[in-house]
Design a protein with these regions (language model features):
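Non-heme Fe(II)/2-oxoglutarate
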Residues: 1-75
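A short glycine-rich, His/Asp/Glu-containing loop-to-beta-strand
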Residues: 69-89
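Short beta-strand segments enriched in hydrophobic/aromatic residues
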Residues: 84-86, 111, 159
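Conserved metal-binding segment of the jelly-roll/cupin
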Residues: 87, 125-142
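A short beta-strand-loop-beta hairpin characteristic of the jelly-roll/cupin
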Residues: 90-95, 102-104, 110-128
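Short beta-strand His + acidic residue motifs that chelate non-heme Fe in jelly-roll/DSBH
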Residues: 95-96, 140-148
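A short hydrophobic beta-strand segment most commonly corresponding to one strand
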Residues: 107-108, 149-160
Length: 160
């Protein structure tokens, strides 16, 4: 596991955040397969199953394959997905999961600072804007909600 603060130049980070916030969002009424009343979030999948699935693919691709590849050193993208978790009264932990059963690598870029976090193998990583978390997504991990911002926003990248 590796944490990199200020992963992107500020202007590129701001551009990426604007693109993500402008994306069409889908409501998902369960997180990690668990369906509960307070267990919902919004997501937008930019890339999955070997194809770009968004009108913003040129911009997202140039940042992921360009700026972030300094850290990721990708051979092949598996998935690029943004998650938006609405604020809750208390920080709510989602269910532990693994992203894929096939070997891959994972990265989470946090797009805003809040009191939510990602827990990887029991270790919490704070959500700080422009922080990049590199980790093994086959290790149990989970997300949380936040209480001190309107939402918690990040981009997940799975790759080989």
């Amino acid at each position: 596991m590796n944490v990199i603060d200020d992963a992107l130049p500020q202007d590129i980070f701001n551009q990426l955040k604007d693109i993500v916030l402008d994306s069409p969002w889908k409501l998902c009424t369960n997180v990690s397969g668990l369906k509960e009343e307070k267990n919902c979030y919004f997501h937008h999948t930019y890339y999955h199953t070997r194809q770009w699935r968004t009108p913003q693919y040129d911009q997202i691709k140039s940042i992921i394959r360009g700026q972030l590849d300094e850290y990721l050193r990708m051979n092949c993208l598996v998935r690029v997905k943004a998650n938006l978790y609405p604020r809750t009264e208390c920080v709510y932990h989602h269910q532990d999961h693994v992203d894929y059963t096939t070997p891959n690598k994972g990265a989470i870029l946090y797009l805003n600072t809040n009191d939510g976090y990602t827990v990887v193998d029991g270790y919490p990583i704070e959500s700080i804007a422009n922080r990049l978390l590199l980790f093994d997504p086959q290790v149990l991990h989970h997300s949380t909600t936040c209480t001190n911002q309107q939402y918690r926003l990040n981009i997940n990248v799975n790759y080989t």
